[in-house]
From Swiss-Prot:
This is UDP-galactose transporter homolog 1. Pfam families: UAA. It comes from Saccharomyces cerevisiae (strain ATCC 204508 / S288c) (Baker's yeast). InterPro entries: SCL35B1-4/HUT1. Residues 26-42, 128-136, 193-214, 267-280, 328-339 are cytoplasmic. Signal peptide: none annotated. The keyword Membrane applies. GO terms for biological process: UDP-galactose transmembrane transport; UDP-glucose transmembrane transport. May be involved in specific transport of UDP-Gal from the cytosol to the Golgi lumen. Involved in the maintenance of optimal conditions for the folding of secretory pathway proteins in the endoplasmic reticulum. Overexpression confers resistance to the immunosuppressive drug, leflunomide.
């Protein structure tokens, strides 16, 4: 790791710059009513398709830059089942989360997306039967408590407390259901991805079959494209037509869409590079801070009103996740000394 400080700084700045911009572009892209079409660009699968296309091209450049010895075509042939599952859960999670914005506010969406630890733990517990430490359970409870406080403490939370029979509450519950489904798929994605990487490292005896972050970035985005095309053909062809109509009537949406996709693709490069060079602990520290700054920027730039209870909820969530990261660091210190 000697002499890697500058690389770490570049990675952190890259993740901050790309994903803070990504988050700021995402909100107007998903919630703004465009003047000519008089509609919102709420076409999650179209957004997913465009973003995956840009990310796949970026992943291809990333592969060439790394000069990997394991051809992506052979990697797909060897691991197509895992890639299909991961890409399916990944491609389904994003549209569900985006659709939830029709029913919940953006800050609730952002905070919920910061709680990926809980579904990951649940998937490991229920699907892979992985023992979960008590500390992880406490952190999961803290995160859940923080989300509850944040939601109830907001203006929308007042409506929930008045009556569960109001018409708006059905939409609110539907939004939470979409967010819950998205988080579960995120957990399934991450857990299956971890299983694939660990199994590959255990069997790998040379660089000829080593799976890198660049491999996953390219192949997973390729499969995401295929899944979305299949969705348009079989389930919802009108979504594509409606999206094209909005883009034709309001061409300025293209600017937001391409900037959103480009920032997401660049962010994936920095994330995978950080994961390979510095490990998951450093990546967790950077991404947790990034999510917190994203919400604060959303408050400042878009004038969101946040009550005291919501701030308490935020600090509980990020405090719990940070505590988890610090505990991982302490657990890794003895391993580093014995190495």
């Amino acid at each position: 790791m000697a002499g890697s400080t500058s690389s770490l700084v570049i990675c952190a700045i890259g993740i901050y710059a790309t994903f803070l911009t990504w988050a700021l572009v995402q909100e107007p892209l998903a919630t703004r009513t465009w003047p000519n079409s008089m509609g919102k660009f709420q076409f999650p699968n179209v957004i997913s398709l465009i973003q995956a296309s840009v990310a796949m091209m970026m992943g291809y450049l990333y592969l060439n830059w790394k000069k990997v010895e394991y051809p992506p075509r052979k990697m797909i042939k060897d691991h197509w089942k895992q890639l299909m599952l991961i890409s399916f859960t990944q491609s389904s999670s994003g549209p569900l989360a985006t659709t939830s914005l029709k029913h919940v506010d953006y800050l609730t969406y952002m905070l919920a997306k910061s709680c990926k630890m809980i579904p990951v733990l649940l998937v490991h517990l229920l699907l892979y039967r992985t023992p979960i430490a008590s500390q992880k359970k406490v952190v999961a409870l803290l995160v859940s408590l923080g989300v509850t406080i944040f939601t109830i403490g907001g203006n929308d939370g007042k409506k929930l407390k008045r009556s569960f029979n109001e018409s708006g509450n059905d939409n609110k519950l539907q939004g939470f259901g979409l967010l819950f489904s998205s988080l579960f798929l995120d957990g399934l994605t991450n857990a299956t991805q971890d299983k694939l990487l660990k199994a590959n490292k255990a069997k790998e005896k040379g660089k000829q079959t080593l799976i890198t972050g660049a491999h996953l970035m390219f192949t997973l985005n390729l499969f995401v494209i295929l899944w979305n095309i299949l969705y348009f053909i079989v389930i919802d062809c009108k979504q594509w037509d409606n999206a094209v109509s909005v883009l034709t009537m309001d061409p300025q949406v293209w600017g937001y869409l391409m900037l959103y996709s480009f920032c997401g693709a660049m962010g994936q490069c920095f994330i995978f590079y950080t994961l390979e060079q510095f490990g998951s602990l450093v990546l967790i520290m950077i991404t947790v801070t990034r999510k917190m700054v994203s919400m604060i920027l959303s408050i400042i730039v878009f004038g969101k009103s946040v009550r005291f209870q919501q701030w308490v909820g935020m600090f509980i969530v990020f405090g719990g996740i940070t505590w988890e990261a610090l505990n991982k660091k302490k657990a890794n210190i003895p391993k580093a000394k014995s190495a």
